[in-house]
């Protein structure tokens, strides 16, 4: 059974391992840990007490910004990402958000399809948003909640 809980400090190392596993240009460890330390909302998904995914988001007034969401590859398409997204949307609504924003790599077709299943719409395209070894454009998406 999958369970969602708030991320705590003891989850950071495992969550960061998932980040490195699935993200072609993962956040630096410093930025990943700093996001938790500055108080961004962070939730994790577990299966039998094993951490298999996480979501990090910030809330400002009526806006939720999905900063990062990842599920270990062995759990892709098994409901963990959906449970994280459903929980994020529900928590955001409770906290007064009216809209969720995100940016996603233009070549990440699986993620774009996942977001479209939630009725996210494309708002804009940021050219050369992602730099480094895997440059890419960012698709800006939003969802009214």
Where do the language-model regions lie?
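Acetyl-CoA-dependent GNAT
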Residues: 2, 6-74, 85-87, 91, ...
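Short coil/turn segments at alpha/beta junctions that flank glycine-rich nucleotide-binding fingerprints
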Residues: 78, 95-98
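Conserved catalytic-core motifs of GNAT/GCN5-like acyltransferases
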Residues: 103, 116, 121-137
């Amino acid at each position: 059974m999958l369970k969602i809980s708030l991320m705590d400090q003891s989850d950071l190392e495992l969550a960061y391992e998932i980040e490195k596993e699935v993200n072609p240009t993962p956040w630096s460890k410093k930025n990943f840990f700093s996001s938790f330390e500055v108080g961004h909302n962070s939730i994790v998904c577990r299966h039998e007490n094993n951490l298999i995914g996480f979501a990090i988001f910030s809330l400002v007034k009526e806006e939720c910004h999905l900063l990062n969401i990842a599920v270990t590859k062995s759990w892709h398409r098994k409901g963990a990402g959906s449970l994280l997204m459903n929980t994020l949307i529900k928590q955001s609504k409770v906290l007064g958000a009216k809209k969720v924003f995100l940016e996603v790599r233009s070549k990440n077709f699986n993620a774009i399809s996942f977001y479209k299943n939630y009725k996210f719409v494309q708002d804009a395209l940021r050219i050369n948003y992602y730099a480094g070894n895997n440059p890419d454009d960012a698709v800006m998406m939003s969802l009214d909640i």
